[in-house]
Swiss-Prot record:
Keywords: Repeat. InterPro entries: CIMAP (IPR051291), SHIPPO-rpt (IPR010736). STPGR repeats lie at residues 21-30, 63-73, 119-148, 157-203, 213-243, 257-268, 351-377, 400-410, 433-443. This is Sperm-tail PG-rich repeat-containing protein 2. Transmembrane segments: none annotated. The keyword Repeat applies. PANTHER family: SHIPPO-1-RELATED, SPERM-TAIL PG-RICH REPEAT-CONTAINING PROTEIN 2. It comes from Homo sapiens (Human).
Length: 459
């Protein structure tokens, strides 16, 4: 209404139709738009585009109704290639987090995830919609997936019912000289043969520091504060009226170890084996170690009567006959000898390995402290000097029975078995060689000896 542009009425001027009426004949030719002078519709000078898209070549682009004779090339129909446009998201989701691959033609191909993936994160979760909610919440043991029983780890702490709230306080007595860790170890440590060498070397290297100053009880000072310095105490001030040494150093007692004072390095198996091998006696003949005596020595020794020879009077009178077999004291009889075959081993001060009573010694040393009796003669003297209950004088030795106190038992004589023989073991050897009295000196030697003796007397 307010437009001053010219109106074009030429579209309606066509009076007749064309010869061939078709789709392309309806296009009305448009006039070229000329620049209008300040006559802008709606006060705007911008170019207006038409709502209809007009192709440059209408006949070539789209065939009309008269183009029914289609060529052979147009009859071959090709399937159109469909290319899906892949949109790259800004936030990667579950299946689009592995990136994309761009081809040469500009197409984008999505990279697929690997077969197994152990990564975790907010973009890697794959929700399972096909599984029920009850199975997702169940956290027990699936019997189809488990290969064995589940083993619970053992904890060192106490359990729910093992707490002792009320604790009894016990007084602990600790020995300063012995460490607390060493008091519980009552097992003896015996090193091996190859460990002794190392222990001996350590003992030589790390020697204990010995102080030069003597102990409190080792001073022998005769002077006192009440007496002058020049005067010395005599025998009257010595206790018990004796000036002998009270405690002598005995090597025997030092070598004997106590219940808990074994020196493993000195009293080892090697040293004991060496001492046994050095003191081992030679093997005797026929497995016997009885000392053998000659007949001459035996006759001289048996000249005086012994304790068993006083019963000969009863045998000679025929009053009583003993049951003993004759010649029983003969050392040379094969079967009737009662002489001891082995030497009597003297009593050793050191006890045997099996004579230790570990339970008793532990109770006396750790639990109940009792008085231990002395084990040697020197220890008995030391203990007896301070005990008031010891006897001062020796007991009176009672004499033996007199001559009239004997009551001989008369028994019948037992017959001597026939197979027992009193044959001597070593018979007297007969000398076959002639003695000095069997030789006769010739007459010429006798005359020469007489002349020599006469000449010696004259001189």
């Amino acid at each position: 209404m307010y437009d001053r542009a010219p109106r074009l009425l030429k579209l309606a001027e066509g009076g007749s139709t064309e010869a061939h009426v078709g789709p392309g004949s309806y296009q009305v030719p448009f006039l070229k738009q000329q620049a209008t002078g300040s006559n802008a519709p709606f006060l705007s000078l911008t170019a207006r585009e038409s709502t209809f898209t007009i192709a440059s070549s209408i006949e070539k682009a789209v065939p009309g109704p008269g183009h029914y004779n289609v060529s052979e090339a147009q009859k071959i129909s090709r399937s159109p290639t469909l290319t899906r446009s892949v949109d790259v998201p800004s936030i990667p989701s579950c299946g689009k987090s592995y990136g994309y691959h761009i081809n040469d033609d500009g197409s984008i191909i999505k990279c697929f995830p690997p077969a197994c993936d152990s990564t975790l994160g907010p973009a890697y979760y794959k929700p399972q919609f096909d599984v029920s909610n009850a199975t997702l919440k169940y956290k027990g043991i699936h019997f189809g997936n488990s290969s064995g029983r589940q083993e619970l780890p053992k904890k060192s702490g106490p359990g729910p019912g093992q707490y002792d709230i009320v604790q009894k306080k016990t007084s602990y007595y600790e020995n300063v000289n012995i460490k607390r860790d060493q008091q519980q170890n009552y097992c003896s440590f015996i090193p091996r043969l190859y460990e002794i060498i190392v222990l001996q070397e350590k003992k030589k290297r790390f020697l204990p520091m010995k102080s030069i100053t003597p102990a409190p009880g080792t001073y022998n000072e005769p002077r006192t504060a009440l007496k002058s310095l020049k005067k010395t105490s005599g025998l009257k001030n010595i206790p018990f009226g004796q000036s002998a040494v009270r405690f002598t150093q005995d090597i025997r007692t030092e070598e004997m170890p106590g219940p808990g004072f074994y020196n493993v390095l000195n009293n080892t198996i090697i040293a004991s084996v060496r001492n046994i091998c050095s003191k081992k006696q030679k093997k005797s003949a026929f497995g016997s170690s009885v000392p053998r005596t000659f007949f001459s020595v035996q006759k001289e020794a048996c000249a005086t009567p012994g304790p068993a020879d006083y019963q000969e009077f009863w045998h000679s009178q025929g009053v009583g006959i003993s049951d003993e077999l004759p010649n029983l004291t003969n050392k040379y009889a094969a079967f009737l000898s009662r002489a001891k075959r082995t030497m009597k081993v003297p009593d050793m001060v050191i006890p045997a390995p099996g004579s230790y009573d570990v339970h008793k010694s532990y109770e006396m040393s750790q639990v109940k402290h009792k008085y231990m009796p002395p084990r040697s003669l020197v220890a008995k003297r030391k203990h007896a000097s301070f005990l008031s209950a010891t006897p001062r004088c020796l007991e009176k030795v009672t004499d033996g029975p007199g001559p009239a106190a004997y009551n001989p038992v008369l028994r019948k004589s037992c017959p001597i078995p026939l197979f027992v023989k009193a044959s001597k073991r070593f018979e007297e050897s007969k000398e076959i060689t002639p003695g000095p009295a069997t030789y006769e000196i010739s007459q010429e030697k006798k005359k020469g000896n007489l002349i020599g003796e006469m000449a010696a007397d004259i001189m």
